A protein has these predicted regions:
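Disordered, charged N-terminal biogenesis/targeting segments of membrane/secreted proteins
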Residues: 1-51
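N-terminal cationic amphipathic segment used for targeting or macromolecule association
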Residues: 3, 60-64, 69, 133, ...
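General helical structural elements
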Residues: 34, 56-57, 61, 82, ...
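Internal signal-anchor transmembrane helix that establishes type II topology
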Residues: 48-76
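Beta-sheet-rich non-transmembrane sensory/scaffold domains
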Residues: 78, 82-683
């Protein structure tokens, strides 16, 4: 229901004026300082947009730098034991400002007043001369797949028990009981593979393709899928352009990009049928599904309207929207959290992180059981069985913990740590603590640091309690290097950093208040992903490099962690370029789900692309390659070629005694015993 304003317009204006007049513009944000830096560094820089997992911002570049590293989630709350009011949660950074408390809005007008105040703060800065040096641009902040553990489980547990009960592989789950989405799913009889805006499906048996269809075929690009309780859940993104609107100042107009995250619910089987749809405003961030059937979806919303263009009664212009079977609704005010005080950031738009929950066991699984919208953005998402963590930031990372229980989302605590997280595997909840590894750019206050030209890095591993207060930390490892991958196994963390070599650190976390480095093992190249192979073996996959740190191809390494104080590499396999004009790459370097890892069946597979550039001709070879591991050595099994132009396998799954390689244009099957081709089908 639309709310009425609690205060008159004149009263608000007086308060806004009082706040604005009391603030000073920082020296580094004065127009002359920004102009010097932009003249030096911005030039013709291209700005990349990743529509899959981004917190998207269409704002002037100079203002973007001030906003991007701000504490977007520094305003989270924790409840007191009575649950009656919000309390400020102490920051994990000893030298950081305390985190402002948040509250649920009483009505929509309170949300309107908050963003109007933020807009006027931004307008004040612009009127002081910033418009002379601002250039319109787009910044897309990566939320790299972008964190995970259980008691002696987590991403490190092999998750064999559930797979032993079925004769087909599934997406590797980093946290036991928390299921991961992917672009391929199977029920053992049918394969569903998402490519662009289409789902390629095949009914299979014993390596044969009995029937194939294509469905979905909407305008939205498919991001992820789940297969649960005979329901196929398809998550996709729709990117749209709005009409020109005023942006803050009179006659200052722009066309805006806005995104929706869509979920389509289908029956599973050979011929899926649509049973319902849900649309949530905002760009898709991430999703999780607990094994009891509750799905949690995260998106980021940002609207760009000047408050001059609408009144508080026009709530549809600033309140997050969602729809069930195309029936449009708006998030209720008592589900919208805003800071009690306007933050010192340059918000000139209404930005929210939206979290929705669904019960997939219900008769209408497309009806949300809960929706929470929080002022700010979300980046990397990590989920344990009982808690969902949202992070955001670069110079500092803001962390917010939400409890999740049977489709109910409840904000609990927030905190802050130095640096940025590499991906979701950089975090682990274990025995009442959250462990989080970060990289700090020690020159990130300089413009060299902003543009990524600095090599001055430090790395931290924090241990936080459930109120996200610091219990312990260790730092100063991997100096001048950045974290590439993290693997937590119980009380031990394994962290890979890289600049020239690949140090693998083993860190003892048995005393949460006093983490200790047990060993540092160096090897050329780096592992971008690590997964437990067995109790004493750690599998690493990443990029190979020479002694100077120049990347040469991809590699597979088996580490012996029997004694964490004496790490070693038992075997390494590299696929490198042979000539100067060759390039070897693998999607698995940045997307670990492209790998097939099955310790029970003793098989490891990943896609490889080899490009050759010569004066006479260019050559491209794409294949999926397989290895086994036995007695301290990798053994080459075979590689399945993809002979179609401009196509590459990027997934493989096992059903029974057969493995299926998948791409956007074709499926291929092979006998597990010999890994020889059985059949292929094109789409």
């Amino acid at each position: 229901m639309k709310g009425e304003a609690n205060m008159s317009e004149n009263y608000n204006d007086k308060n806004i004026k009082k706040i604005l007049e009391s603030e000073n513009v920082p020296q580094e944000l004065k127009p002359e300082s920004i102009k010097i830096m932009l003249d030096k560094f911005s030039g013709e820089r291209k700005i990349k947009i990743n529509f899959k997992r981004t917190a998207m911002r269409v704002i002037p570049i100079a203002a973007a730098f001030a906003v991007t590293v701000s504490a977007a989630f520094g305003y989270m709350l924790k409840y007191n034991h009575d649950g009656d009011k919000c309390l400020v949660s102490e920051s994990s950074l000893n030298d950081a400002d305390s985190v402002d408390s948040m509250k649920y809005a009483a009505d929509y007008s309170e949300v309107y007043n908050y963003f109007k105040l933020a807009e006027k703060k931004a307008s004040r800065i612009k009127s002081n001369g910033y418009d002379e040096v601002m250039a319109d641009g787009v910044i897309a902040e990566d939320s790299v797949e972008y964190s995970v553990q259980e008691e002696e489980v987590n991403q490190n547990s092999v998750n064999v028990s559930s797979q032993q009960k079925k004769a087909y592989s599934d997406t590797y789950n980093q946290e036991t009981g928390v299921l991961e989405a992917d672009i391929v799913k199977t029920d053992g009889n049918n394969i569903y593979y998402a490519c662009g805006n289409v789902i390629n499906a095949a009914n299979v048996k014993d390596g044969k393709f009995l029937n194939t269809i294509q469905f979905h075929k909407d305008e939205e690009a498919i991001n992820d899928m789940y297969l649960y309780n005979n329901i196929l859940i398809v998550i996709s993104s729709a990117n749209n352009f709005s009409e020109n609107v005023n942006y803050g100042e009179e006659n200052d107009c722009c066309g805006l990009i806005y995104n929706d995250t869509c979920i389509s619910f289908y029956t599973s089987g050979e011929y899926p049928q649509l049973i319902g749809t849900y649309t949530q405003e905002g760009s898709y961030n991430d999703v999780r599904l607990t094994d009891n059937g509750y799905l949690y979806l995260v998106s980021n919303t940002e609207k760009y309207y000047s408050s001059k263009d609408f009144t508080s009664e026009e709530f549809e212009k600033y309140i997050p929207r969602y729809s069930v079977n195309q029936e449009v609704k708006y998030v209720e005010p008592d589900c919208i959290m805003i800071p009690e005080y306007c933050p010192d950031v340059l918000y000139s738009s209404s930005a929210f992180a939206n979290i929705s929950a669904f019960n997939l066991n219900a008769e209408t699984p497309y009806e949300p059981t809960d929706i929470q919208s929080v002022a700010g953005f979300s980046g990397t998402v990590y989920c344990s069985y009982e808690n969902l963590y949202l992070t955001f930031g670069y110079e500092d990372t803001e962390i917010t913990r939400f409890s999740i229980n049977s489709g109910k989302i409840t904000p609990q605590a927030s905190g802050k740590v130095k640096g940025y997280v590499n991906d979701q595997f950089s975090m682990s909840e274990y025995n009442g603590y959250l462990r989080i590894a970060t990289t700090v750019n020690m020159r990130n206050n300089s413009w060299n640091g902003v543009f990524g030209d600095s090599q001055d890095y430090n790395n931290y591993l924090y241990v936080l309690d459930m109120e996200l207060r610091e219990a312990g930390k260790i730092k100063d490892f991997g100096l001048d290097e950045t974290i590439k991958s993290v693997n937590f196994q119980g009380d031990t963390a394994y962290i890979v950093t890289f600049r020239q070599t690949d140090p693998l650190y083993a860190i003892d976390l048995s005393d949460p208040h006093n983490p200790v480095i047990m060993d540092e093992f160096k090897i050329n190249g780096y592992s971008s992903y690590m997964q437990k192979w067995s109790d004493n073996l750690l599998l690493g996959f990443g990029q190979s490099a020479d002694n100077d740190g120049t990347l040469t191809g991809v590699k597979l390494t088996m580490f012996d962690n029997t004694d964490p104080e004496n790490l070693s590499a038992l075997d390494t396999v590299e696929i490198n370029a042979d000539y100067e004009h060759e390039y070897v790459s693998s999607e698995a370097v940045w997307e670990r789900k492209a790998m097939l890892i099955d310790p029970e069946k003793n098989i490891i597979g990943f896609p490889v692309t080899e490009d050759s550039y010569y004066s006479s001709e260019n050559k491209n070879e794409s294949y999926y390659i397989f290895y086994s591991y036995k007695d301290g050595h990798f053994n080459y099994l075979n590689k399945i070629q993809n002979d179609m132009e401009y196509d590459a396998f990027n997934r493989a799954i096992i059903i029974g005694d057969y493995v299926y390689m998948l791409s956007g244009l074709q499926f291929k099957s092979a006998d597990m015993a010999t890994l020889s081709n059985v059949e292929s089908v094109e789409f």
